[in-house]
Structure formats: structure tokens, C-alpha cells
Amino acid sequence: MNLKQKYLTDVVPALMKQYGYKSIMQVPRLEKIVLNMTAGKEVTNSKAIEEVLNELTQISGQKPFQTRAKKSNASWKLREGMAMGGKVTLRRDRMWDFLEKFINVAMPRIRDFRGANPKAFDGRGNYSFGVKEEIIFPEIEFDKIRRIKGLDVQIITSVNNDKEARSLLELIGMPFSKGEK
């Protein structure tokens, strides 16, 4: 059973019972997942930008769009409008496929992983997770990358509070670290 089926058959009824929703349309749902990666120190190198875009394509299965600098920064040798990295927004089936791969394959491969930080919610029901090494994804071949880069993952939900969003992600299978709720 894939993650979308699990959501429809197990998670929706559990959340309806837990929070007393009258309609299925009130139940929290995932709206989108946004992946963001930058070239970091190699922002002036066009090959590094291409590498970022290729890796995001491999990870997400969708072509990313190039992100550009909003402001110039002399210490980073960055000029306004200069390419910095890439960004992908996943919705519907690609979102569910990515989340399943992220939870079941990539997260267990994170070095010293003890669970996702339960405090990383933004106060509006959205969850952000930073990955330090993109090589945790099986699509990325370690031999073909020049430099290890990080990746930002934002999970956007339909609810406006963190408690319900956390319940949704826990029931889907997100491994949160033990400790504060």
C-alpha cells in the first residue's frame, strides 16, 4: 500500500475521530512539497548551478526552475539577478511518491538520524526539514558529484496550526524524535 492509499484509508478516519471533524473536507491534507537547493560557495560557477538543477531533477522527477539572487552581496560575490540554485514544487502523485521515498528510503540513510525535529513547524501548520547531504537519495551517484550540497524540504499542509499538522505527519509515518510534543 502506497502512502496516498494509507492516507485515504487509515489517516483520514483516524484524524476525523481524533479531532471530531464532521466532513472529510475538514481533514488536514498535504498541499505541496517544495524542494530548494543552492550552489552555496560555488554560486559564481555555472557548472555548479547546472549540477544543482540536474540533482534536483533526479531527486524530484520534475524539472526545477532556477532561483536568482534578489539582492547583491559583495562578500559572497553575488550580484542581483545571478543564478543561485533551483527550486521544485511537487503536488499530487509526485508529492506522495517523493514523500514515501523520503520517509522510507532517504531518512534512514541520514547519518546519526534520531528522528525529525518536532519543533520545525512554522506556527501555521507547515513543516521544514534541512538535509545536509543530498547523497541520501538513491538517485544521486556519489562518484558523479563534485561537492556535497544540502537540500531544504518544506511540507505545506492545509491546516493553520502545528498540532493538527504534526498529527497528520505522524500518522503518515514521519519519524519525529522523542521528546517535546
From Swiss-Prot:
GO terms for biological process: translation. The keyword Cytoplasm does not apply. The keyword rRNA-binding applies. GO terms for molecular function: rRNA binding; structural constituent of ribosome; tRNA binding. One of its GO terms (cellular component) is ribosome. Keywords: Ribonucleoprotein, Ribosomal protein, RNA-binding, rRNA-binding, tRNA-binding. It holds the Pfam family Ribosomal_L5_C. InterPro entries: Ribosomal_uL5, Ribosomal_uL5_bac-type, Ribosomal_uL5_C, Ribosomal_uL5_dom_sf, Ribosomal_uL5_N. Part of the 50S ribosomal subunit; part of the 5S rRNA/L5/L18/L25 subcomplex. Contacts the 5S rRNA and the P site tRNA. Forms a bridge to the 30S subunit in the 70S ribosome. This is one of the proteins that bind and probably mediate the attachment of the 5S RNA into the large ribosomal subunit, where it forms part of the central protuberance. In the 70S ribosome it contacts protein S13 of the 30S subunit (bridge B1b), connecting the 2 subunits; this bridge is implicated in subunit movement. Contacts the P site tRNA; the 5S rRNA and some of its associated proteins might help stabilize positioning of ribosome-bound tRNAs. Belongs to the universal ribosomal protein uL5 family. PANTHER family: 60S RIBOSOMAL PROTEIN L11-RELATED (PTHR11994). HAMAP family: Ribosomal_uL5_B (MF_01333_B). This is Large ribosomal subunit protein uL5. It comes from Mycoplasmopsis agalactiae (strain NCTC 10123 / CIP 59.7 / PG2) (Mycoplasma agalactiae). The gene is rplE.
